[in-house]
Amino acid sequence: MKAVIQRVSRASVMVGGDTVGEIGPGLAVLLGVAEGDTQADAEYLVSKIINLRIFADGEGKFNLSLKDLCRELLVVSQFTLIADTRKGRRPSFVEAAQPEEADRLYNLFIRLCRGEGVQAATGKFGAMMMLEIHNDGPVTIILDSRDRLNPRQ
């Protein structure tokens, strides 16, 4: 499971011209589910994202997390994060989870966030969406749940 997280001053997602999710200050999360991902991958990313200290304290240092500040999340599914571009010029998506499993894990991710007391707005799984993201910083971080299996030495 991969996530691109962006610290935002605000963000929204539209489907068919209608706003389906919006937040104020917090994090926009683009979430891609890969074949073989499990609940453990979702749990790892939820814990990492909501506790990642990427908000400035009074001295301007990254010492505060989304959870510390009671900020919001906007979670949008994005299977293209699982693209394999190693061969040729057309991305392959064969490593992305099947839609039913991806939808299940995407919704689990959202439930886990909400279970931690985090306000989480969402896009619509499988829909064509328009995102408006006001990146704050900018701060953009890429997380991969498989990294938990290979910690730094």
UniProtKB/Swiss-Prot annotation:
What EC numbers are recorded for this enzyme? 3.1.1.96
One GO molecular function term?
A: Ser(Gly)-tRNA(Ala) hydrolase activity
Instruction: Show the catalytic activity.
Output: glycyl-tRNA(Ala) + H2O = tRNA(Ala) + glycine + H(+); a D-aminoacyl-tRNA + H2O = a tRNA + a D-alpha-amino acid + H(+)
InterPro entries membership: Daa-tRNA_deacyls_DTD, DTD-like_sf
Question: GO terms for CC?
Answer: cytoplasm
Main EC class the enzyme belongs to: hydrolase
| Location in the cell | Cytoplasm
**Highest taxon listed in the record's lineage:** Bacteria
Q: Which UniProt keywords apply?
A: Cytoplasm, Hydrolase, RNA-binding, tRNA-binding
Short motif Gly-cisPro motif, important for rejection of L-amino acids, span: 137-138
Instruction: Tell me which stretches of the chain form a coiled coil.
Output: none
Tell me the GO BP annotations in alphabetical order.
Answer: D-amino acid catabolic process
Show the PANTHER family listed in the entry. D-AMINOACYL-TRNA DEACYLASE 1, D-TYROSYL-TRNA TYR DEACYLASE
Entry's family note: Belongs to the DTD family.
Q: Assembly and interactions?
A: Homodimer.
Q: What is known of its domains?
A: A Gly-cisPro motif from one monomer fits into the active site of the other monomer to allow specific chiral rejection of L-amino acids.
What's the stated role of this polypeptide? An aminoacyl-tRNA editing enzyme that deacylates mischarged D-aminoacyl-tRNAs. Also deacylates mischarged glycyl-tRNA(Ala), protecting cells against glycine mischarging by AlaRS. Acts via tRNA-based rather than protein-based catalysis; rejects L-amino acids rather than detecting D-amino acids in the active site. By recycling D-aminoacyl-tRNA to D-amino acids and free tRNA molecules, this enzyme counteracts the toxicity associated with the formation of D-aminoacyl-tRNA entities in vivo and helps enforce protein L-homochirality.
Know the name of this protein?
A: D-aminoacyl-tRNA deacylase
Q: What is the lineage of its organism?
A: Bacteria, Bacillati, Chloroflexota, Dehalococcoidia, Dehalococcoidales
